[in-house]
Design a protein with these regions (language model features):
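Active-site recognition of the HExxH zinc-binding catalytic motif
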Residues: 203-223
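Acidic/His-rich structured neighborhood in mature extracellular/periplasmic domains
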Residues: 126-207
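Short hydrophobic helices that act as membrane-entry/anchoring signals
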Residues: 2-20
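Propeptide-to-catalytic entry region of secreted or membrane-anchored zinc metalloproteases
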Residues: 31-147, 168
Length: 341
């Protein structure tokens, strides 16, 4: 072939390349879910509310000072340290704002204590008013909580009240709210995020705060495993105790240790076989049972039992059937429940 012919062929090849269809490319596979999500740390931001009524306007005396109770700040310090420790550092609460309510909130039915009547109840000179609950709508409106949670100012609300104030240990509101040791708050669906209102008491201790949090945990993990087949419901297995599953105890629940025979029976010295240690290896279950009794969890002390119980909650990487092996992901942030990993 002459040089001129080669030149013409190169020219034709150039023009053909301008109008030719591009060579087909191999299809790009769809992005797949991370089948081994890491056990990431979760931090919940808290609005801390002291429900501390003004009892004597003349002297400025408020309820907490008159009664000599603990401060919310001192209780929070111990509670938050326990959560950090039991979660192996994967869960933490951060108080981002504090507020104080100095008048007396109404109950849901409209009843409201006068300061003198409230003191009579708290000092046991009169019987308490038996109402279903405090007016949560009034509380949330005062705090502008629905809008502010929607805006991301904070994630949940902790209210430190007093005996007979009408607060549940925990209650959930917002779009998609579900049972959280009490029925969901109605009229809160305008908030696109689930929010939890914890009800604590300055009359009590850190152990009782862990009790309230423990019931929150029970409700949330039950919701996580709702709809799972029985053999895949790991929380049902986690909560077994000897009284209802003889010889098959695992960790138990908030009220029942592995060997408990009644509610709050955390000081029972009876030995029973338990696979509680198995949960430190989750999801690789299969360890042998061993004999345990109350020596393991504080011999009846409420705080020590609840710390022991919470330490057993899984916090591993990965997932099974779409449920994260790190349960703290859900215990802290209810918006993770039902969310695709």
């Amino acid at each position: 072939m002459s040089g001129f012919s080669k030149f013409l062929d190169s020219i034709f090849a150039f023009f053909r390349s301008l109008y030719a269809r591009p060579a087909p490319q191999p299809p790009v596979p769809p992005a797949r879910d991370d089948i081994n999500p890491p056990a990431v740390r979760v931090t919940q931001r808290v609005l801390l509310v002291a429900y501390n009524p003004l009892i004597n306007p003349g002297t400025g005396q408020k309820l907490f000072d008159i009664m000599g109770w603990r401060t919310p700040e001192s209780l929070c310090e111990g509670f938050m340290a326990d959560i950090m420790e039991t979660s192996a550092g994967l869960a933490s609460f951060q108080v981002v704002e504090q507020a104080e309510i100095n008048d007396i909130l109404p109950f849901k039915d409209g009843f409201r204590y006068e300061p003198a009547a409230l003191m009579d109840v708290l000092q046991r000179r009169a019987a308490p008013y038996r109402a279903e609950q405090v007016d949560y709508a009034e509380l949330l409106a005062r705090l502008d909580a629905l809008r502010r949670v929607s805006a991301g100012d904070f994630d949940e609300v902790w209210v430190f009240g007093y005996p007979h104030a009408g607060f549940y240990e925990s209650i959930m509101g917002g779009a998609g709210a579900f049972f959280c040791n009490s029925n969901p708050l109605t009229g809160t669906e305008t908030c696109p995020r689930r929010l939890i209102v914890m009800g604590f008491s300055v009359e009590r201790g850190v152990g009782e705060m862990l009790e309230s949090f423990g019931h929150r945990c029970e409700s949330i993990v039950r919701q996580v495993y709702a709809g799972q087949p029985a053999e895949a419901n790991y929380f049902a297995r986690f909560t077994r105790y000897d009284k209802v599953a003889p010889g098959m105890a695992e960790v138990g629940n908030v009220h029942f240790a592995p060997n408990s025979e009644k509610d709050y029976d955390w000081g029972n010295p009876r030995f029973v076989p338990s696979r509680c240690d198995d949960w430190f290896n989750f999801p690789n279950l299969g360890s042998s049972a061993r004999q345990v009794n109350c020596d393991e969890w504080g011999k009846g002390e409420i705080r020590q039992h609840h710390i022991w119980w919470l330490r057993h909650f899984p916090h591993a990487a990965g997932q099974i059937n779409g449920v994260a092996n790190n349960w703290w992901r859900y215990l802290m942030d209810p918006n993770q429940v039902g969310k695709r990993l």
